[in-house]
């Protein structure tokens, strides 16, 4: 048998074990529980923590973005380093939105301020512009012991929360933002999970239901599984550039109320993995729907700087909410999220982010503050970087021209790569790619022949997982199967980032297109 095929099957077997199943398909909790009891009877071992005794919700958690495809990609990289011959010379990881890992250069101003915050002796270095030094000094002044190595307040450094509030006010045309409603966090993911923890309760038919878009970012399904909440799917309209349809929301909510208590509506705008940008009208409709149905709104807006398509504009849910008047602005409960990891910054490793809460019950807000206090505080270097992002150089300051040139170059390149991705993928008869209006991903639909579907099913794989694993083994291109994000039954997709350098992206897209044609011919 082909060694690469053996390796990929080993990875798939490993993933079954990782998700609580033996190679024969027997639940490991059942098998290992018997083994543990038998060993206990023999007096040799008595494990307290087994798959049978552990939290069952954890075994339900899945996160496709770092699933079996990525495990195999890492193995292939090691094999290439060891001189193993492959039909490709490198593995291209187009599976995750990590801009710097894909070669994007850091924004100079952000790194200069961060460098001085980390090593204040650099304040004496003449290579650093004065506005950089002033920004770093202001941040350090707000830190305990004037060091970002100190803990901060659990909600985040007050000066930085004030700067975040001012940023939101500028973004939203002067609508007031209260720093006391701002919670800094370890990336946006941390605050999203924190908010879900507050919202989820109940048992049986009273269990909290959370409406999430399908396709979705797997953080949501993973968090809901861990919290034992009910995932309530509403499907985006692929035929209409992945638009959100209020009628579909209503259908989903009506069905969910038969078996759970839906309380939360999650929106991702711009979309991940689907790359759509919602219109203002759509956002207004969603807010009205949430008000009518008494739903808590969660607006994931981490890609708010990533809008490329002509005619598309980012509208924050908060801005639209307040412009709709007191009927909505004084009643609809909203939490919105932003991050240092996306946008033009791409500073994933700093783990910076924030959440703003609107119309939250003061007593619940006290509980939220208590909950975040348990984890002491978000990483202070991430807080410092967030401050520089929301409080960038102003016209006339020494760093302004370079900062704007670098920012515009990054966003301009992303816009061009979004256009290229759609154009090249749509040249293949079996691939259909909607316009990448925003964010960092395309989510093309692929035709998979019936023969390949049956082979995949025989191996216990989703058909698009089968396709993506073959793609990786034969081309070195690592993308994520659409089944990991959710999709309508009978359709197949994959998610890929548009982050690789332009030349590498062109090559990747051409190779992907050629592979799909070859794959289709082989299995037809």
UniProtKB/Swiss-Prot annotation:
Database matches in InterPro entries: ALAT1/2-like, Aminotransferase_I/II_large, PyrdxlP-dep_Trfase, PyrdxlP-dep_Trfase_major, PyrdxlP-dep_Trfase_small
Listed pathway(s): Amino-acid degradation; L-alanine degradation via transaminase pathway; pyruvate from L-alanine: step 1/1
EC number: 2.6.1.2
The family this protein is said to belong to: Belongs to the class-I pyridoxal-phosphate-dependent aminotransferase family. Alanine aminotransferase subfamily.
Residues modified as N6-(pyridoxal phosphate)lysine: 342
Cofactor(s) in the UniProt record: pyridoxal 5'-phosphate
Its job: Catalyzes the reversible transamination between alanine and 2-oxoglutarate to form pyruvate and glutamate.
Oligomeric form and interacting partners: Homodimer.
Name of this chain's protein: Alanine aminotransferase 2
Record's keyword terms, sorted: Aminotransferase, Pyridoxal phosphate, Transferase
Class of enzymatic activity (EC top level): transferase
One of the GO BP terms on file: biosynthetic process
A single GO molecular function term of this UniProt record: pyridoxal phosphate binding
SUPFAM superfamilies: PLP-dependent transferases
Signal peptide: none
Catalytic activity: L-alanine + 2-oxoglutarate = pyruvate + L-glutamate
